[in-house]
Amino acid sequence: MAGNSQRRGAVRKPGTKKGPTVGSGGVRRRGLEGKGATPPAEQRTKHPAAKRAAVQRKIADAKQRRLKQGDEAEMVLGRNPVLECLRTGVPATALYVAVGADNDERLTESVALAADAGIAILEVPRPDLDRMSTNGLHQGLALQIPPYKYAHPDDLLARARAEAQPALLVALDNISDPRNLGAIVRSVAAFGGHGVVIPQRRSASVTAVAWRTSAGAAARLPVARATNLTRTLKDWQDKGITIVGLDAGGDTELDNLDGVGDIAVVVGSEGKGLSQLVRKTCDAVVSIPMAGPVESLNASVAAGVVLAEIARQRR
């Protein structure tokens, strides 16, 4: 007979497949059927993989918080930003160059400056550089900046005491722009200040942008972080430091400020000004008299004006 109809096993013997139980309507059998696709192990709360995934999420969240606080290495991307960092002496640990990157004057100078500074120069495949820069626009060049090593607020006062000079300190309140931070650091260094203190939270950090704006002053002037800025200011008051706030609505004009003694200038943001607690802590709040219709100055410009006046009085 044609075909495989006579092959042993080709025809199921009667009674080999049990149907639904008579009288049950197949309910008990259907109850054993699956309830859909099994979710991934990471989504099953009691599975070890889910616990591991939860731990990894916590680690990632913590890392993200540290990144926001400037406690992690930073990647500067692009040929112009990288070259500017190297020209201004921003400390770096590695210069990454993509394999096959188009050579131009910026790339050549960046490699030369990195070599002169003893910075490691690493040639990496472009996909690796894409991954390292989280697919940012790197133009085949990236510079790794180590996290800034902040001083303690007490170190700033100790530095002033060691130089046997009246202390000149600057505290920043609500300053979120790293360019303002860098410009203020530059002014403090230019006018003989002993350091800058910033809050640990809700403040700009010493990033590559701040480094570049400071024109290298961040390498010479210590920047400290205060867990609680108000508490730090009160501690300085107890040690004989006059706390002077800088605000457009201040009750004392800059012309009447006595800047000869130990002083700490607190600079608020152009928009928010000084926070309420910091303002209450100040011994005086100074304003800068202006002849024109401008109501306020940029925070870094205002800080420079006050520091220049204090330096003039001390000469």
Curated annotation (Swiss-Prot):
Q: Sorted alphabetically, which SUPFAM superfamilies does this protein's record hold?
A: alpha/beta knot, L30e-like
**Could you give a GO molecular-function term held by this entry?**
RNA binding
Which NCBIfam families has this protein been placed in?
Answer: rRNA_methyl_3
GO BP of this protein: methylation; RNA processing
Q: Return the similarity comment.
A: Belongs to the class IV-like SAM-binding methyltransferase superfamily. RNA methyltransferase TrmH family.
Name listed for the protein in its UniProt record? Uncharacterized tRNA/rRNA methyltransferase MAB_0572
Q: Does the keyword Transferase apply?
A: yes
The signal sequence is: none
InterPro entries on file: Alpha/beta_knot_MTases, Ribosomal_eL30-like_sf, rRNA_MeTrfase_TrmH, SpoU_MeTrfase, SpoU_subst-bd, tRNA_m1G_MTases_N
Instruction: Please list where the region (Disordered) is annotated.
Output: 1-53
EC code: 2.1.1.-
Q: Record-annotated residues binding S-adenosyl-L-methionine?
A: G268, I288, L297
- Which GO cellular component does the record give, naming just one? cytosol
Under the heading Pfam families, the entry gives: SpoU_methylase, SpoU_sub_bind
Keywords, ordered alphabetically = Methyltransferase, S-adenosyl-L-methionine, Transferase
Q: Which chain positions lie within coiled-coil regions?
A: none
